[in-house]
Amino acid sequence: LFLLLMILQSCNNTDTNQLVSPGLKVDSKDSLKLNQVINFNLIEYPGVFLKSEGLEEWEDFKKLHESLKRLSDLNLRDVQVDLLSLSGRLKEVSKKTLPGTLEVPQIRSRLKVVEMQAQKSRYFTQYYREDSLILSLNKLYESYNALVSRMTTLDAENAAVSQKNIKENQ
């Protein structure tokens, strides 16, 4: 009997129950914004590399990098608009022939991966789950950083192969 009374008392204890107003809804986007600080690692704009390749006027790539930089601020209210803009810029870049020595399968495939990750992130803005959007955006930035890294290392690899070919031909 004592145990039964104790169980009933604990169920009626209003101090331990959470009181939530029936009209109050907590949006998962807002709770995410309030509870977490999210940092996306965006690689620096490869200005030196682009200048050495004679591509400092490559406007499509500048706009693409600016879109990713804007998205890294992660204003959850505008994330869908930012991703839509980013997807458009990625389509523009992928439709055109890449300049200089960048039109190779290694760069083209990484560009496609970035485009796919942007589409995936757009999907998660519509069918939002608190952790899935952030995870998807992290993968988007990893993919973009891999693209830029590959662009910069491709030049070094081409130079090394050229040096090897010159030595073999002598």
Q: What does each model-found stretch correspond to?
A:
Residues 7-10:
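C-terminal motif of bacterial Sec signal peptides marking the signal peptidase cleavage site
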Residues 1-3:
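Sec-dependent signal peptide recognition
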Residues 31-47, 51, 122-170:
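C-terminal amphipathic alpha-helix
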Residues 57-71, 79, 86-93, 107, ...:
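Amphipathic alpha-helices that form helix-helix packing interfaces
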Residues 92-108, 125-127:
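Short, solvent-exposed, charged loop/turn and helix-capping segments
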Residues 17-21, 88, 101:
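Contiguous segments within soluble domain cores/interaction surfaces
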Residues 13-80:
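Immediate post-signal-peptide N-terminus of mature secreted/exported proteins
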Residues 57, 64, 94-97, 101, ...:
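Extended amphipathic alpha-helical interaction segments
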